[in-house]
Amino acid sequence: MADLYQLQRAMRAMRQSAFQRGALAILDLGSTKIGCLILRFDGLDPSLDSDQVGSLAGQSSFQVVGSAITRSRGIEFGEISSMQEAERAIRTVLQSAQKMANLRVDHLIACFSGGGPRSYGLNGVVKIENQIVRDEDIARVLSSCDLPDIGDGREILHAQPVNFALDHRSGLVDPRGQIGNNLDVDLHMLTVRAKTIRDLAHCVKRCDLELAGVASAAYVSGRSTLVEDEQELGAVCIDFGGGSTSYSIFLKKHMIFAGSIMLGGNHVTRDISLGLQVPTAVAEKIKTRNGGLIATGIDDRDLIEVGGETGDWEHDRRTVTRSELIGIMRPRIEEILEDVRAQLEIAGFYELKSQKFVLTGGTSQTPGLDTLASRILGQQVRIGRPLRIHRLPQAYSGSSCSALVGLALFAAHPQDEWWDFELPNTSYSSRTVRKAVRWLRENW
């Protein structure tokens, strides 16, 4: 655990250095595309009313000065599969974004959806020594949290306090300075495979940059697409990526659970390619232009020219109906939604009073997805687009860029993490996530 704290604190120090230099690169490592933004920081933003505890909360105002997107290479299921290919793709997108910004950056923050994320709900309690809560008490109560056995080869990606209680007065955001006898904390911890982070750090180093932070794509997508009421009352953001589909549950403006399944839009494209006997590139084009999930009477008469370059005139000139295409696409999307629902049930999401679903990511733009999702997941479903940020190009305002925009918000205005405090070394056993979600529902 100490090694992890050192790694995370070192990245935070690099982030502070980037703030001082005034520029930072943001990188979204997707299986379909890699996106990059160059942010220029203008210093502390006095207009921000931060409700966080840590010293980095509400850090800086910023604007986008460079941006680029390139086709993903060397990335599968949200993590690096080929170091050389990934390095070339990252160099390409970084060079394009830096050229647009007309400046060079030395630090980079990245997000990814891979690594097999696992969520844990932790709880800790300490007695206040002088009755007035101080920074030392915050550190002590965090260190008293039950530490789970996360297993070999895994590291903590996020460890965020989501609720403080002082003498059973729950829902406190910042208890410092208040008077009481017992301080409780609830903390959400997200772990991933250590190899995923190590490969990313090594690849960034090969690109002559320093890794100044990492984040879950599910988490940052939620930060950019969920409106304030949804984050407060309870909602889940489902990010439909190319290689995987990730999701994050928010309550009281904090992420309390996250996970992913290894199915995404690329699997739909593959199904079309196999079903229509066409190359993957043609299948992707057909999916984008003509795809859908809810068939109507007119779709039986709506003909789609498949095309091809086999040399067989009849084969290359054949057509299929849109109903046939929907029949190929829908089973895979239903499988993804049913798998997500199963994991949300395990997490206890359906025990929350508010059950809103926000769909984002490239595949979320498929016509009829919101209707199909409302039948499988729940009634309150909408398609989410990222918040507008200063000087963000219009091309980056769609659902496919939710994680990229959310990562920019995360970089400038991070929430507190466990390692932001000086912690003594203590370990106990963990609580289950379902108990943690139920506790939050009953006490907040």
Task: Please tell me what each predicted stretch does.
Residues M1-V236, H254-M255, G265, P279-I326, ...:
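Nucleotide/phosphate-binding catalytic cleft detector across ATP-hydrolyzing
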Residues A110, I272, L359:
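Short, conserved catalytic/metal-binding motifs centered on acidic residues
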Residues R134-E136, I261-L274, L369-D370, L377-R385:
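Gly/Ser/Thr-rich active-site loops/lids in small-molecule metabolic enzymes
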Residues M189, I238, I261, M329, ...:
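Glycine- and other small-residue-rich loops at beta-strand/loop junctions that grip anionic moieties
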Residues L233-G275:
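Glycine-rich phosphate-binding loop of actin/hexokinase-like ATP-binding domains
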Residues I249-L251, G259-S260, G308, G361-T363, ...:
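Active-site proximal loops enriched in glycine and acidic residues that flank catalytic Cys/His/Asp
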Residues G264, V268, Q365, S400-G406:
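Catalytic-loop motifs flanking and including active-site residues across diverse enzymes
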Residues E314-R391, Y396:
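C-terminal structural cap/anchor segments
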